[in-house]
Swiss-Prot record:
One cellular-component annotation, GO: nucleoplasm
Subunit architecture: Interacts with WWTR1/TAZ. Interacts with YAP1.
Keyword Transcription: yes
Tissue specificity: Preferentially expressed in lung and in skeletal muscle.
Organism name: Mus musculus
Function: Transcription factor which plays a key role in the Hippo signaling pathway, a pathway involved in organ size control and tumor suppression by restricting proliferation and promoting apoptosis. The core of this pathway is composed of a kinase cascade wherein MST1/MST2, in complex with its regulatory protein SAV1, phosphorylates and activates LATS1/2 in complex with its regulatory protein MOB1, which in turn phosphorylates and inactivates YAP1 oncoprotein and WWTR1/TAZ.
Name of the featured protein: Transcriptional enhancer factor TEF-3
UniProt xrefs under Gene3D superfamilies: 2.70.50.80, TEA/ATTS domain (6.10.20.40)
Subcellular localization: Nucleus
Keyword entries, A-Z: Activator, DNA-binding, Nucleus, Transcription, Transcription regulation
A Pfam family it matches: YBD
Region of interest (Disordered), residue spans: 1-32, 163-206
Biased composition (Pro residues): 194-205
Transmembrane segments: none
Length: 427
């Protein structure tokens, strides 16, 4: 790997985590309408549209600084809308009942046996939450159908008219509420009616549309860390931020989308800026990552401290990649580092690894100053105007392989760094 030093523009050059409200586990009210009255069912359906399936991960409500499981959030939504208490277990049981009902409806609706077998095979790999969830189910069945296969219309819907969308609770930013769109199916999976897909029809790899990946490059891992040597043989590593995408599956929901115009002012606008890059394309290479950084570590001992960044990528192609990382303040570039990485062939694909790349002095000082602020809201106020733009290109063709915009808050959890990934689109 070859690497340039950090330079200024003017220079020559996710586990299951306990949390949420204990009130959600209280016994149900003995309301006369029964456990799932029409009013409660409406609120339940609203919550399904608002909160996507998230597996064992937690959803962070930035207004409260708390993390909730999806069923907790659904129960919370029912309580807020109706005043009736439903437990997480009741929500889980209701989802399973609806999933079985939906599976039976789909079997009855599909006349073609091959299509029915394909749908059943697809549903077998899904959780009840994903079957019931509107967007996840639609995306999954689109993949099961393949190009040109009929959509199963009538079995999914978006957020109900007049109800809040996802952005009301799961937001990429704390101060400014940017519209978050539901996941979009990838090009090539279309509706309505068409023939059964050919067995030879190509299926997009599972990471496309579900993780930070374009058609030519997939980010496997990204981390920024502080490493200390405790003794000659022992190192202690603290992760400020971390992304791991090593094992996506077709059962994972598609990423939500954010209109890229909502974040133009947070990144450089001159030549080579985010706007120009997006106009040049390809459009499937652009992503937004909201980090909740973990600053819960002692950073005063500088003697043996190393601040670094590591990242790893995979591609079906052998090429030389260039990774540009721009640190921005109030939308203006402060420093930039450019690194070049060569491919290593392994198990039928090419790996690119940028290992222990040192953080610049500006970033180290920034972390120190941030850490010494007395309150988290002060840190978040500073971070609102701090962003990082990472652009990975093919060195020889200058094609954009990945463009990732990073925004930050401080994690309010004792369980470490958190993140949420969005696709950037232009509506």
């Amino acid at each position: 790997m070859t690497s340039n030093e950090w330079s200024s523009p003017d220079s020559p050059e996710g586990s299951s985590i306990s949390g949420g409200s204990q009130a959600l586990d209280k016994p149900i009210d003995n309301d006369a309408e029964g456990v799932w009255s029409p009013e409660i069912e409406r609120s339940f359906q609203e919550a399904l549209a608002i909160y996507p399936p998230c597996g064992r991960r937690k959803i962070i409500l930035t207004e409260e600084g708390k993390m909730y499981g999806r069923n907790e959030l659904i129960a919370r939504h029912i309580k807020l809308r109706t005043g009736k208490t439903r437990t997480r277990k009741q929500v889980s049981s209701h989802i399973q009942v609806l999933a079985r009902r939906k599976a039976r409806e789909i079997q009855a609706k599909l006349k073609d046996q091959a299509a029915k077998n394909k749908a059943l095979q697809s549903m077998a790999a899904m959780s009840s939450a994903q079957i019931v969830s509107a967007t996840a189910f639609h995306s999954k069945m689109a993949l099961a159908r393949g190009p040109g296969y009929p959509a199963i219309s009538g079995f999914w819907q978006g957020a109900l008219p007049g109800q809040p969308g996802t952005s009301h609770d799961v937001k990429p930013f704390s101060q400014n509420t940017y519209p978050v769109q539901p996941p979009l199916p990838l090009p090539g999976f279309e509706s309505p009616a068409g023939p059964t897909p050919s067995p030879s029809a190509p299926l997009a790899p599972p990471w496309q549309g579900r993780s930070i990946a374009s058609s030519k490059l997939w980010m496997l891992e990204f981390s920024a860390f502080l490493e200390r040597q405790q003794d000659p043989d022992t190192y202690n590593k603290h992760l400020f931020v971390h992304i791991s995408q090593s094992s996506p599956s077709y059962s994972d929901p598609y990423l939500e989308t954010v209109d890229i115009r909502q974040i133009y002012d947070k990144f450089p606008e001159k030549k080579g800026g985010l706007k120009e890059l997006f106009e040049r394309g390809p459009s499937n290479a652009f992503f937004l990552v909201k980090f909740w950084a973990d600053l819960n570590t002692n950073i005063d001992d500088e003697g043996s401290a190393f601040y670094g960044v590591s990242s790893q990528y995979e591609s079906p192609e052998n090429m030389i990649i260039t990774c540009s990382t721009k640190v921005c303040s109030f939308g203006k570039q402060v420093v930039e580092k450019v690194e070049t990485e060569y491919a290593r062939y392994e198990n039928g694909h090419y790996l690119y690894r940028i290992h222990r790349s040192p953080l610049c002095e500006y970033m180290i000082n920034f972390i120190h100053k941030l850490k010494h602020l007395p309150e988290k809201y002060m840190m978040n106020s500073v971070l609102e105007n701090f962003t990082i733009l990472q652009v990975v290109t093919n060195r020889d063709t200058q094609e954009t392989l990945l463009c990732i915009a990073y925004v930050f808050e401080v994690s309010a959890s004792e369980h470490g760094a958190q993140h949420h990934i969005y696709r950037l689109v232009k509506e």
